[in-house]
């Protein structure tokens, strides 16, 4: 990956959350884009990475949705006087990356006890589920952005997606009164430029060479007695006879020559 594409990929994390499709729509669009490559058993980089994130997102998404459903169902059995665990006592995504997966439950339980030692068991389970679901959602968000990048590189080409991210970032960072009303779209960037017809006349046939050519003098000719005669050389008055008709004989030619037989 060249430096421009690497920079554009890093900028994907800074794009607004609502720029990306919802998880269900994203996975469906990605599968549609990947299907031709799956049929041909392609091993392109973008195909392999996008396939990995499709599987990862589907598994994480289902697990996260299940956590939310169980947590909501536990609300009915939590004592109404129980205060929710403050956000500061819940493990955040950045902290979870530094903690081994097997120790995640232990660290979260210690924080809940430090908040309230006799915290009800149902409320503890609810707090655990909410913390893990939040961690999963942030991981899903990162995976969602990466999946969007890789399957769009398959659809539009890595260079076009890189150019699009650069233009979109420029548009977002420009004050509203100095930028266009609508954000740039990748469809508009990749659309071929059409030249208006009729603006210039096109000549068919052989192409004339460039540069100046010496002008050739045109010599007008006429035909007299089947021969070509240059008008530039003969400036005499025109004959009343038509071209190609016999000229009248002179008076001396009217006398018939004696026959050689006499």
Curated annotation (Swiss-Prot):
Residue interval(s) of motif Bipartite nuclear localization signal: 215-233
Entry similarity comment: Belongs to the avihepadnavirus core antigen family.
Keywords annotated in UniProt: Capsid protein, Cytoplasmic inwards viral transport, DNA-binding, Host cytoplasm, Host-virus interaction, Microtubular inwards viral transport, Phosphoprotein, RNA-binding, T=4 icosahedral capsid protein, Viral penetration into host nucleus, Virion, Virus entry into host cell
GO molecular function, one term: DNA binding
Purpose: Self assembles to form an icosahedral capsid. Most capsid appear to be large particles with an icosahedral symmetry of T=4 and consist of 240 copies of capsid protein, though a fraction forms smaller T=3 particles consisting of 180 capsid proteins. Entering capsid are transported along microtubules to the nucleus. Phosphorylation of the capsid is thought to induce exposure of nuclear localization signal in the C-terminal portion of the capsid protein that allows binding to the nuclear pore complex via the importin (karyopherin-) alpha and beta.
Modified-residue entries (Phosphoserine), positions: 232, 239, 245
Protein name as catalogued: Capsid protein
Pfam families attached to this UniProt entry: Hepatitis_core (PF00906)
GO biological process assignments: microtubule-dependent intracellular transport of viral material towards nucleus; symbiont entry into host cell; viral penetration into host nucleus
Organism of this sequence: Duck hepatitis B virus (isolate brown Shanghai duck S5)
UniProt superkingdom: Viruses
Subunit organization: Homodimerizes, then multimerizes.
Gene: C
Signal peptide start-end: none
